[in-house]
Amino acid sequence: LHVRGFTQDVSSGVKNKGTFAGIREKIPYLKELGINAVEMMPIFEFDEMGSYRNYEGRQLYDYWGYNTVCFFAPNTSYESDHEHHHEGRELKQLVRELHEHGIEVILDVVFNHTAEGNEMGPYFSFKGIDNNIYYMLTPDGKYYNFSGCGNVLNCNQPIVQQFILDCLRYWVTEYRIDGF
C-alpha cells in the first residue's frame, strides 16, 4: 500500500488525501474487503526532489520513497498535520486504529541503498559520519552499485548491522509495527 497513492485521487472519498490520516479514513473499506494486514511501501523520510524532473510539461518527483534520508523518521509529507513537534503522531494513530480493527502493519524497508547516491550524490548522513564504513567502496573510492541506485550499505560492518537492528527495533517499540 502506497500512503500517497492509496488516497490521493478524489475517487478515494477521503478528506486527507495522500496521508496517514487518509488511510485511517479508509479502514472501514479495508475491513469490508477482509484485509487483516497491510504492507506499506517505504514510509521513512525520503528525498522527494532527488529525481525531480519535468516530463511533457509536468513536474515529476520521487514517488516511491526508496531513497531514504532518515530511517528513524516517518515521511512528513504523508502527514496532514504539519504542526511543529507533531511528527509521527498520525502514523502512531493509524497503526493503533488498524490494530483495533484486527489489521497488522508491515513495512517495506530497504536498507541496501540510501538517498546519498554515488560519489556525486549529496551528504545526508552516512557519507559524513564514516563513508568508508557505511558504504561498500571500490578500491579507487567509487561506490559499488549492486542495487542500481548508486550505493550499497556495507552490511559486513558490525556498526551497520547494529544500525539496522536498532532501526527495526525502534519501529517495533515506538510505532508498534508488526513486521518487515
Predicted segments — roles?
Residues 22:
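Active-site beta-loop-alpha junctions of metal-dependent nucleic acid enzymes
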Residues 4-18, 28-179:
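Substrate-binding/active-site clefts of carbohydrate-active enzymes
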